[in-house]
């Protein structure tokens, strides 16, 4: 099996689920199309990643799993922060609010593809300026969409509740992926 991602969290989830995966990241243009909604974007990107890697690297019968995760607050995409100031801006925006984490997943095997989008609602506690500054100072938010990692030592303390799949917020709804793999 090929995992078309270099995300350490996705690699770990696939290996913990018992899959022996080759890691081959896709190199595609991830720019959103004009008027493309966040959920359409993640599904399109997952499909493009899976197709690109399958075309170049997959052996006969070998599945390719690709995923793309975004954080959206009131329709605004929150990607990985550009710098610490950007991380603070995102965390202030998320403070006390519910946002969505969406992961698009695509599995390609022998030319056929199955894709889906999983959406989880995440609600943050009200965060103080000091809490945000302290969290940003850990460095933990800097490589994560929305400037937080729910699985992180500190990021987990920001989240009041979730409605949906915890592992989707981590970066891969692994139970749904396993079920989809059994169908393809």
PLM feature spans:
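N-terminal beta1-alpha1 ligand-phosphate binding loop
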Residues: 1-19
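Cofactor-binding loop segments of dinucleotide-utilizing enzymes, especially the Rossmann-like FAD-
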Residues: 6, 26, 110
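Short glycine-rich, Thr/Ser-proximal phosphate-binding strand/loop in the N-terminal lobe
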Residues: 18-36, 113-119
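Anionic-ligand binding patches
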Residues: 2, 15, 38-184
């Amino acid at each position: 099996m090929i995992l078309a991602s270099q995300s350490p969290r996705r690699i770990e989830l696939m290996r913990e689920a018992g899959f022996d995966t080759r890691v081959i990241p896709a190199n595609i243009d991830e720019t959103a199309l004009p008027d493309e909604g966040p959920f359409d974007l993640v599904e399109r990107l997952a499909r493009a990643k899976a197709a690109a890697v399958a075309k170049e690297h997959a052996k006969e019968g070998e599945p390719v799993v690709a995923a793309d995760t975004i954080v959206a607050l009131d329709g605004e995409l929150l990607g990985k922060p550009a710098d610490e100031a950007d991380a603070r801006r995102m965390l202030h925006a998320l403070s006390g609010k519910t946002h969505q984490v969406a992961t698009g997943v695509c599995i390609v095997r022998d030319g056929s593809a199955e894709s889906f989008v999983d959406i989880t609602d995440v609600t943050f506690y009200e965060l103080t300026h000091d809490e945000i500054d302290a969290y940003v100072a850990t460095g933990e938010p800097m490589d994560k969409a929305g400037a937080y990692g729910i699985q992180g030592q500190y990021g987990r303390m920001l989240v009041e509740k979730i409605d949906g799949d915890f592992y989707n917020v981590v970066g891969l709804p692994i139970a749904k992926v396993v079920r989809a793999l059994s169908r393809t």
